[in-house]
Amino acid sequence: TGGNPRFVPIVCTSGQHRALLDQALTVFSIVPDHDLGVMVPGQSLFYVTRTALARFEPVLRQEQPDLVIVQGDAQTAFVGALAAYYSRIPVVHVEAGLRTGDPYAPFPEEMNRRLIDRIAALLFAPTAAARRNLLAEGISDESIVVTGNTEIDALLYVRKSVPPRIRFDLPGRIVLVTAHRRESFSGGIARICRGLRRLAERNREITIVYSVHPNPHVSRVVRDELSGAERVTLIDPPDYASFVHLMADSALILTDSGGIQAVSYTHLRAHETPEQLVCRLLLEKK
């Protein structure tokens, strides 16, 4: 809020992916006012939805906010918007209007963001293309503000102002990999890993660095397929600042992440590196 006394932010986190969340909050000196503590091993979409909805309701009753701001397309973002709607509190959606056109790709994020955009009273679209998507769906132009991408804002701030906690001293050209999307669980992650193994075997000048998501549906497969592979280094997800600098040091980024897709382009423009390959069948129209 920049210290504006008209606004009093109340931060509520879902608690999903605890280690990843805590390190990101630390970088930006954010201390949540409420933590829903949703995460449990092997959680399903049904569990996340009902648990987050039940735990967010008393927060809304206690705080009685004038607005609820949700960002992105995660299941908890949708639940936050739905809980606010049930409480008759206006919703603001950050990253509104991103679309692939297929309700099952990415799953469940594509449907989550469509539903959030129907609930929201004010929609912060990251691009003019996202605004056009919203207009095409019949959403009023007066409800849409093109704001730019907050992930890119965060990356630029960290790259300039926050040194990495970890520096990766690796030989050759770095190929950085992340892959974790739910639609890749049924064989997709394994196929990506086998492709990476072949890539490393055929290109002796590279080192593949795979930042392995903690979800067991991902980590178990990746470690089974790639542990011990030549010129492949598996790492736990580093802190946010270290990852930003690792991206900048990479010659190629292979990812299925929409967020990394967006910020990789910023690195590309700033450094003429890295290139990126997006491991998904459909992309958001950004």
Residue ranges and their predicted role:
Residues 5-55:
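Conserved nucleotide-sugar phosphate-binding/catalytic loop shared by glycosyltransferases and other
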Residues 92-107, 121:
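A short, histidine- and acid-enriched strand-loop-helix "catalytic/donor-clamping" loop
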